[in-house]
Amino acid sequence: MEIEKIQETIRMIADENLDVRTITMGISLLDCIDSDSDRACQKIYDKITTKAQDLVKVGRQIEAEFGLPIVNKRVTVTPIALIAAASGDADYVKYAKTLDRAAHAVGIDFIGGFSALTQKGYQSGDRVLINSLPQALAETELVCASVNVGSTRSGINMDAVKDMGTVIKRASELDLMANAKLVVFCNAVEDNPFMAGGFHGVSEPDVVINAGVSGPGVVKAALEKVKGQPMDVVAETIKQTAFKVTRMGQLVGTIAAQRLGVPFGIVDLSLAPTPAIGDSVAQILEEIGLEQVGTHGTTAALAMLNDAVKKGGIMACSHVGGLSGAFIPVSEDAGMIDAVNAHTLSLDKLEAMTAVCSVGLDMIAIPGDTPAETISAMIADEAAIGMINNKTTAVRVIPVAGKQVGETVEFGGLLGHAPIMGVNKASSAAMIHRGGQLPAPVHSFKN
C-alpha cells in the first residue's frame, strides 16, 4: 500500500505536472517607516535582503532533496501605502524601485505588496500610491501591486473603483505587462502567497513562510478513472486528490520555514493552472462532463470542484489560508483559451463562474479602446459579488492598445497568451462618476 502511494506521488510529479507553485516569505516593513523616504527605502532594502537572503537557496535544496519542483520563490511585504505615508513624498515610485532592487538582489521571482487598502476610504498614502501605480509598474520588473477597494464589512469604495479604472487604462498605455502585475480586490486576504495579489498583512508575524500548491493535472488524471460515475463520487475523488496535493505543500512549507528559522504560516489550496497542456482547470471541468468550458453547467461543475478542493485540503493541513480554490485565469489556461476562441466562454460567463470559485476576472485581455469607466464598472461588479458572498474576488484585466476582439496578445512564460475578449458597449460612466461609498450588506452586521 505504502509503495503504491509513493509510486503514485512520483507519477503525479513526473506525468501530471504536480508542483509546489510557490514558497512565499512574508516580511513586515512596519519597522522601516521613516519620515525621510531615502532612509525608509534603505531600511526596506536592508530588511528584505537580510531576511530573504537564503530563500532561493533553501528552495533549491528542498527541490533537489525531495524531487519536488518549486516553481517560484517570492516575497510579500506590508502594503507600501502604509509604510510610505510618513514620508510626505509626491509619488512612491522610489519605493517600488527599492522593492525591485531587493528582489533582484535575493534572486526571487516576484515581490508583492506595492499595495493600498482603501475599502472604507482613502488614507494619506493611498491616493499617492494609486497615482504612482502606472509608472511604478512600468519601470520595475518584479514588483506586483494590489488595491483592495471593498469588503463585506465595509462596503465598496466607489471613488477607488473609479480611480482604478483610470489607473489600469494609464498603465496599459505605458507598458503592456504593467496590468499583469496589478490586481484590484474585494475582501483581500493578508496571507496570500500567490501573485500578483499577495501582500503581507499588518496582523501577520514579522516574517512568515506561506506555500501555494498546484495540481490541476493531478485532479484531471484522477477523474479519468471515474468516468460516468455519479457526482458525489467525482467530488470524493477530487477531495482525496486535494488531500495528497496539500500534504505535499505543507511538507515543503514546514521544512522551508524550519530551515529559514521563521514560523510556517499557511498552505493556499488553490488549483493554479499554467499554459502547459494537461495543467488546466478548464480541462478538469471538461473531464467532469462538459463538452467545453463555458457551456451551461460550467458554474455548477466549478462550484463542486472548488468545494471539494477545500474539503480535502482542510483535512490535510491544519493551517490553510490565502485564496484557496480554483483559479480561472484565461491567459494561463490552455482550455480557457480554446473556449474563448470557440466563442463558448464569454466575459459574462466568467463573471458567473467567479461567484463560486477562488478569485475573479483574471488575466483577461480586452480591447485597448475600452473606456476607463467600463473597466471601473467591471471592478464594481466583481467587488459586489465578493461583498455579498463574503468571499475574495478580484479583477486583473489587460487593455491591449491597438488590438480588437478576435486578435491575440502574447505575454510569455507562466502568463501565456490571450485572445482579446469583447466588453459591453453600453456606457456605465454616469454610475461610476457618482463615486461615494456603496454600503455594506445587511448580513455584514455580525456583532
UniProtKB/Swiss-Prot annotation:
- Pfam families listed in its UniProt record: DUF711 (PF05167)
InterPro entries according to UniProt: UPF0210 (IPR007841)
Instruction: Name the domain of life this protein comes from.
Output: Bacteria
Instruction: Enumerate the HAMAP family for this protein.
Output: UPF0210 (MF_01221)
In terms of NCBIfam families, this protein maps to:
PRK05313.1
Spell out the family assignment given in the record's similarity comment: Belongs to the UPF0210 family.
Q: How does it assemble?
A: Homodimer.
State what protein this is by name.
UPF0210 protein LAF_0976
Q: Which species? A: Limosilactobacillus fermentum (strain NBRC 3956 / LMG 18251) (Lactobacillus fermentum)
- Taxonomic lineage from the root: Bacteria, Bacillati, Bacillota, Bacilli, Lactobacillales
